[in-house]
Amino acid sequence: MKFFSVVTVFVLGLLAVANAVPLSPDPGNVIINGDCRVCNVHGGK
């Protein structure tokens, strides 16, 4: 049972990292809550 919990935490961690890093050709665009083409987040400007 402990092995199952460790695997679950590992998989959830991978999903969190995959969601935090958008797979887009331009790393300057950060996708937040949906399909955003030109969302540049730099110092709130």
Curated annotation (Swiss-Prot):
Cellular component aspect of the GO annotation: extracellular region
Signal peptide region: 1-20
Family: Belongs to the bomanin family.
Expression by tissue: Hemolymph (at protein level).
Pfam families: DIM
Propeptide: 21-27
Domain of life: Eukaryota
Disulfide bonds: 36-39
Biological processes annotated in GO: antifungal humoral response; defense response; innate immune response; response to bacterium; response to mycotoxin
Name of the protein in question: Bomanin Short 1
Sequence positions bearing Glycine amide: 43
Functional summary from the UniProt entry: Secreted immune-induced peptide induced by Toll signaling. Has a role in resistance to bacterial and fungal infections. Has no activity against the fungus C.glabrata in vitro.
Protein induction: By bacterial infection.
Chief location category: secreted
Species assigned in the record: Drosophila melanogaster
